[in-house]
Structures are given as C-alpha cells and as structure tokens.
Amino acid sequence: MHLIVTEKDIAAKRIAEILSGGAASATKVAGANAYRFNSTVVLGLRGHIVKLDFSDEYRDWKTNLHDLIRADVVTVPTHKTIVSGLKRAAKDADRVTIATDFDTEGELIGLEACTIVKSVKDVGVDRVRFSAMTPIEVKRAFRSPTRIDLNLARSGEARQAVDLIWGAALTRFISTSAKRLGNRFLSAGRVQSPTLALIVDRERKIAQFVSEPYWEIYIDLSTSSETFHAKHQADRFRNKASATAAIQNIGDTATVVTFAKTERVDAPPKPFNTTEFLAAASALGISASRAMETAERLYTAGWISYPRTDNTVYPNELDLRLSVSMFRSGPFAENARMLLEKKQLVATRGKKQTTDHPPIYPTMRATQADLEPQSWKVYELVVRRFFATLSDPARWCTKKVTLDSRGEQLRATGLELSYRGWRYHYPYAQTQERYLPDLHEGEVVTVTNKQLVEKETQPPQRWGQGQLIKKMDELGLGTKSTRHEIIKKLAQRGYVDVNPLRPTGIACSVTQSLERYAPTITKPEMTRLLEEEMDKIKTGTLSKEFVVVSSTNILDMVLSTLDEQLEEISKSLQEGLRGDATVGTCPQCSSDLIVRRSKRGGRFVGCSGYPKCTFGLPLPKSGRLRITARKCKEHDMRLIKVQSGKRFWDLGCPQCNYSSWVEKNKSAQKAGD
C-alpha cells in the first residue's frame, strides 16, 4: 500500500481527487480521516501532531528558570487520533510519500510524520514538493519525488526549541513577578516582546506629541472659462499674524509666473510575496491572520499558488500567457483580452528572488459563484495583482503653476491620469486626480475667493497590521509564516486592540519594565541574530544543537540581569497593572472604580473606597476581561471587551450595559402586566 501524508485533511482530499481522477472515497484509519483509491491511502494531518514541551518535573512555575532553560525537552502528541491513524496506516505501507507544504514548518511536520512511521515500520519514505495544488503541478511532483530536506527540518526544530525555551522562561518570570498566574498569566517571547515594543513605542510617541497650530491659505481662481484652486507658496504659516497679513495682501487678480507640463511614468507593482500580500489585504480591511487563513484555503483548493513565500520574481518556467489565457471567459475576460493582445508579456521583478516557491499568483479560474465572499475578495486581489504585474506602466500628466498677486507667491499642481496601464487592472492603488487648466506665462487670472484655514500638526498614526508586518520583515522579526500569528497572539493575550493596533495598559507596563531592566528582550537585534543563525542551519553551515545552545546562553545572561532587578521589576509591573485595572471614577464618591470579586468569587465593577462606598456594576461571570483605553463619552468609563476562547465581544461601558439591562427588564415587566 502507498501511504501519502499531507499537512491537513483538506489537502489530503484535494490530492486524492487529483491522483485518482475523482475516484477516491473517504474512509477512516483508526479514527483518522483518510481517502482511498486503488492501493493508495492519503491521510491528512492537522499541522503539527506533536509538540515540544518540558517534562512533568518542570511544569511547576516555581522551578528555577536557569535550570528550566537547560532542561531536556520531550516530544508530546497533540492529536492522538491522527497519530494512531498514521501508525495504523504505516503497518500496511510499503511506500510512504510526504506531501506536506514545502517550507520550514512543512518540512518539519513531514519529518515528524516520518519519525512516527519509522517507529512502526522501516519503510521507504520519499518527499514531493509543489507550489500549486493543480493537477499539472501535483502529478509532476509525484513523478519526481525527492527526499526530506533534513537541514530545513532541523531549522524548524531549532526554532521550536528556541521559542519554547524563551517563551516559557520569560512568561514565567513576568507572570510570577506581577503575581499574575493561572489564566491571567502574562506572556513574553523572543519575537512577541520586540514586536509589542514597536506598538508601545508608537503609542508613547502619540501620547507625547504636542500639537502645534499652523495656518494655510487657499485661493480659488478662474480664467475666462475655467476655475482652479491654489495655495500660498509658503504652505504652512506658523504665525497667525503673518498668515493674516499675507491673505489680506492678495489682490483681486494673479499673474502666471511659470507654467510647466510634464509626463510622469507610474511603474506597475511587483509580484506578491507574503509580506506584500498581507499589507495589501490589510489595506482592504482584512486582518493579517484572516487574510492568511483565506489564502491557505484558496491554495489548498487549487485556486492560487502557495501563499507563504518571500519571492517577488516569477520563475522562467511559469507560462505567463497560459496563466492569463484561462481568464478569457468569466469576470476578468476583458482584463485577459487586453493583456493577450500584447506581443510579449513581461512581468515586473522585485528585489527578493528565491527558488522554493514563486510569488503568489492565480492557478485556476474562479467565479464569484465558486467562492464565499471573503475568499472571492482575496482571490480577486491576487488575480488583479497578477494582471498588474504584466501590464504597461500608467502615465500621469503633471502640471505646475506659480502665480504672483501683489507680491504674494501662489502655487497649484494638477495631476491627471493620461493612460491607465496597470491601474485598469488594479484599482486598489488610488491616487486623487487634481484638475488644473493649461495656462501661459503672463496670463492674468481672477481671484474669486480666498480662505485662511487654521489647522494643527498631527501625531504619528498607529500601526496598521500590514504596516507592522512590513516593519517586522524589515527588522528581521519572525518569518513570513509567523508574523501574522504574532499579531494575532498579541490580541488574544490582551496586549493590543486591533484596527489600528493599540496597546493596552498591561502591554505598556510589561514593555516598560522589560525596556528598563532587560532591553535586550525588546530590541530586534537579538531576534534577528537568532533568525540568521537558524537560516544557516538550512544551508548546513550551523547545527541545530549549536544554535539552541547559543540562544540558551544569551537567555541565561538575560535572566541573570532580571534576577538582579526582581524587586524593582515586580513593583513596576504591579503598579502598572493596578492602573490598567481602573475602569473609571466612582459617580458617588469619586474614588477609582476597579474590577473586584465578591465573597462567592463573582466579579463586578466596584468602588475602591469599599466598604465606605458600595457602588457596583455587574460583569459577565465568564470570559477574560480586557479593559481598553477607549472611554464612554457619557460616563467616562473605560470600555470593556470579553474574551471567550479565541474570540472577543464588546461589553462596552459597564454603566451603559447595566442601564440597558434595567430598561429591558422594565419593558418586559410592563409587557407581562
């Protein structure tokens, strides 16, 4: 029997359909889902079916952390049914093929499966790799199997071990220092902490920003037949008196001093790699984790190529004309027709070129009827980006004019899209057109209106998910496969609110303490160094053991520094957490409102002045509370979110929520009467 192992059940189903020509049937192997045809069984895993962990003797959080980080780690099954199914199938197998995703994680998952198989039967194991789940790609891969890349898998093992050791040690230290144990623990990690520091640092700059007023002068002008808008050449006036004097000096007419018209070439975008794709999806309002989940589903179903890639250069073997030709019918027919009319299709090229996977591109034609709305939105983004990379540059007509009105210099700029080029296919990149008529030097135009507008300087914007992922990529924080997961984890742990990314008080407290006493943890340099070393495992330059030991030595020094400052760190964290637990001001006595617990263990918003003041508001019995930085405009109380599992729901203002509940009860009683 030929056993084929895939990374997920949906991938197993797809590969079985392709290889069997649709003749495969669903079955169970020791309770695990599988697909059978002829003498072949395709079994899907659930990602990693084993994990690294510390042995039971190190589960106590009172364990000395220096001992913990040097303790041996053990492999623990996480999906016992699938492990049992894999072992059962291995007994009957005379050939095993690993068909997991071709990246570091996929190679490690494949090695994990191979190890389980070999523990049952010493059978031959080969490896297939593909970048698209299309019949052509999958069948080609199975015609030319290779071996598991042990160096690539070992790199994944090293990352697992390093992340476990750093995460466990730092999380235990921070949580015990803050006296936050159980479900209320505070997490930290080698990638998580510097990423959170970026978000906190941006929030700090926003809080420290002091707005300054400035004034701008806007002028409406007209020729004999057309109108246009201009600004004062000074742009921003820092002094109101100067701005007032300037606008009063502008007369009823203005004379054209210079006029220039030029054409600007607007190059098409580069092919999508993971980072650019997530940034583009984020701009459409799709969270990074949601975008990646959707892209993975599209890949597994055969609609797009593998979405985890650093590559921004299409490989020579990709037939661009054939890829466009499949869209000659359907919703993108006109786009395809325009591209196919070109004598030669030449794609743009980005700076990053790798040999594992191509950039993300469509592999099958879909219609809206084939996909649910979210999947279609992502699929359309990928298709349109692909078309844009094969298109001509857009062209803009740029016009610039300077004018003089009684010695005051004015200016205006016009921008018109003269040739749409790639922008026809990719409407997401919006640039506002501004009309400016053709003028000539010495021409006199009429001033029809002038306006002095007061504005103020604005603080830097909070990170969007796409922007942060680009910054993480630039700083070497995480990998293309993990960056969106890091952001998701920060939200789940109560460290950030999303869209845009805004740190909670807990996040600020933890980051501030780490920055003060162990800045190495919050800086990207250490993490980037470890990532570079793990990349060297892939090439065989370094061993997994060397990298793990090197990382552990760094962590040992960090922990020693933290130990020396334990009392100060504990005090800093607890003070910060107390401030974060404040909901608002008590309307009865003006003391702080905090989250309290009753004698029976129930929680509520209560006055810190208890027992003198007994004001209180109810809270949900279950779920993890997150007190956000946003406040109710009516009651000046901080809004609360409740985490249930991996999802959050808005409780809102405790006072508003309670008042609404009281009103509903009154209405229900009246209806009953």
PLM segments and residue spans:
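Basic, low-complexity terminal or inter-domain segments flanking catalytic cores
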Residues: 2-3, 39, 116, 171, ...
